Amino acid sequence: MVVQVLSFALAILCIMNVPIAICLGAASFLALYMDGSVPLPLLVQRMFTGTDSFTLLAIPLFMIAGRLMEWGGISKRLIDLSMNVVGGMYGGLANVSILACMFFAAISGSAPATVVAIGSIMVPAMIKEGYGKSFSVAILAAAGIIGVIIPPSILFVSYGVSIGASIGKLFIAGIIPGVIMGLSLMLFCYIVSRINGWKSSVKPTFRGFLSSLKKSIWGLLMPIIILGGIYGGIFTPTESAAVACIYSLFVGFFVYKELNIKNTYISFYEAGTTSAMVLLIIATATAMGWILTTEQVPLRIAEALSSLAQSRYSLLLFLNIMLLVTGCLMEPNAAIIILGPIFLPLLQQANIDLIHFGVVMVVNMAIGMLTPPLGVNIFVAQSLQKDIPIKSIISAVTPMIIVLLVNLMLFTYIPAISTVLLKYFA
């Protein structure tokens, strides 16, 4: 009865467009209340336990570092660097947008933040250059999801906490997949631009490249410091996030000199409100996960999938389908916190590497950010150019989703793509 009430309440609340954190918390409360055998204060205790983690401190700290870097002027410097690398080819500005998103992903760890930081500059520039409006917005929405793949990634932190995997290893495992996704989108843009005759008016020079590299190098050093510090044994992932905050303050105030007291306060405020929302989602998702575990739902799912999937290849296919559907309907952090522990026995039974599957799971969630009805990146990108209908953006982004699904299959069935770098950083 508990699972039925939980599922029904969650479905109704989601249909009513209630915020996901409230959906998870209210559905969990109602299920326990109707059951009557578990003291309700235990639900609050489980919510507290879900966020009482030193590792989860990395989430607000990485968000603060990303916002400080953005307000400190890193976005326009990364765009300038990208312009001098790929700006001269067919689809120049589209590819500049993608490369800039890849660079910014290594600083922010958030997909929506990446879309806003790069898109607010590049979408108007692309439209002015003659690119289609829907295409311009769609490419930013698609490229923005790289923000949760290339480290530091908030979703990798959530996954690591949910199943006890090494966050440092997850960060390393996300590098090559993130780069491949970016290059795949760039190839797609190049082909589309040649078909439509979207030539670039940008004329990059080597001197311009060196100048833009010099200006942006301080921002590009941040992910190197983070990963180098973790694997050099200097600090933990959470401590690396704190170091990133201090580094961002130093660069913003003393190097770029674009940070001041006012925009520093705004950075902390924006990061604080966003991370509070994420941590509330994690708290309520943890409580729901505990209820599902108590009701032996993970065991039932494991038995059902084990009977359906006769090999690890078919199992991975089933899991991908489940994750893609979930990613379309649920906030990524909540989905990871709930499904991670449910899938864990299956992964261990099939001898699937947890780091490799972490990349697969996060890529699925990232693609879900492009897919209705949730499609958060589509709505964030559309807010940059409000006169474009959502339907036209969805039409423009659909071929890009197909490209990303091909990438997903590669990451799923060729684990070495995710794990090869671990051999050199172990």
Mark where each language-model region is.
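Alpha-helical transmembrane segments of multi-pass membrane transport proteins
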Residues: 1-426
